[in-house]
Amino acid sequence: MGMGWASSLDDSSYIRENLRVEGAILLAPGADSNGLAVMLADLVRQNLEAKPHKRSDFDAMRGSVAIVAEDAEVALTLQFSNGKLTIFDGIVGIPDVAVRASSDAIINLSNLPIGRLGMPIPTWRDKAGLAVVKDVMTAMREGRFKVLGGAFHPGMMMKLTRVMSVNG
């Protein structure tokens, strides 16, 4: 009988946390027709539900990130404020950071490894993580992956990487 009571406490806190995550990620009107926006909203929601420790980075984020998937001719804006993420279809306002890449490269960022210090640095044994970092670096060197404004907002970029990655 004691187990049932403890279990119900665990269930209720799990439900509260999931409701908190659900309400923290919003699609602005029109963004639900942007497939990449819907996919990124689901990714962040799932990451926060599966790994609650990512919530501290999420809650600390302030500012906006524009993402342009050039091959799909799709753009969106991630607006972080007060523990909430609103995703807009298209570029809204003047973003703090802009990312331009193929849709595959953007989605592949969710596979970046997160090391012990919270940095996207794989261990030498992590072959998949090394491959992702190599692909991103090659695309950047070849001009197929561009990050504008990231150097001026390194904290935001690190938090975004940790929140978006399924690892860590």
Language-model segment annotations:
Residues 2-168:
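Feature captures hydrophobic
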